[in-house]
Amino acid sequence: MNTRPQFRPVLWILALALVLTACQTETAGDEEAAEADAPTETASVESETIAWDYTGETGPANWAELNETYEACAGSRQSPIDLVADDEAQDVNVEFDYTEAEGTLFDTGHGVQVNIEGGTLRIDGKAFALKQFHFHTPSEHTVDGTSYPAEVHLVHASDDGELAVLGIFYEEGEANDFLAPVWEDLESRATMAAADPLMMNAADMLPADRTTYTYPGSLTTPPCSEIVRWHVMQEPLTMSAEQMEALTAIYDDNNRPVQPLNDREIDRVTL
């Protein structure tokens, strides 16, 4: 069984605003103004000026009530979710066409992000351009109720405004060679802001096993728009204890709790 979810079309202008922050939204103020010229860091006016957080009165339980533009946060197709799929993995036509490109470390105000436009993800022939990847600690998605220490989201956008997000879990283990040069500038938020661009290829991030959980969902932060094709990889990658500590020292507990599955189906597919 591989049910193809139908996604509502959205205006490209809105989609661009969403994709460039995807599951991470920037804070307003000096950081935002300083990075205004970077296309992958543009956020909607509402997301920039309306405060939200992961705890307290502006935390996930209240996001939908903070502003009418966040009403989707109380929707029926929200992310993240607990991933459970009993059926055999099926083949689906997904192609990774990543290229080496310049990546820029960026502090969103809610997490660590790397802005990069380096290739595409093709799903059933439809192209989704890579825009950025960012980290959540601990993981947002869970598998059979179990979370991982970290999760990265690779955010892609199509020309018509649909989003495809590829999620990869991390567990503690061997040092991650791909992340090593990025982590050199992860000592503090100040060193992140001063970091030089790095050449990288997102293909080097992918695990060997391309089996994924896929389902229709949403952004995991306000405005929680339900326009995302989620593909969360089954096989986790590793970070060393030192790498994990460096990440959580900057941002920790920046994960939205799992949301109800409702009437959606989770498919397990081989890419």
What residues fall within each predicted segment?
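Anion-recognition interface
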Residues: 1
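Alpha-carbonic anhydrase
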Residues: 4-7, 12, 23-271
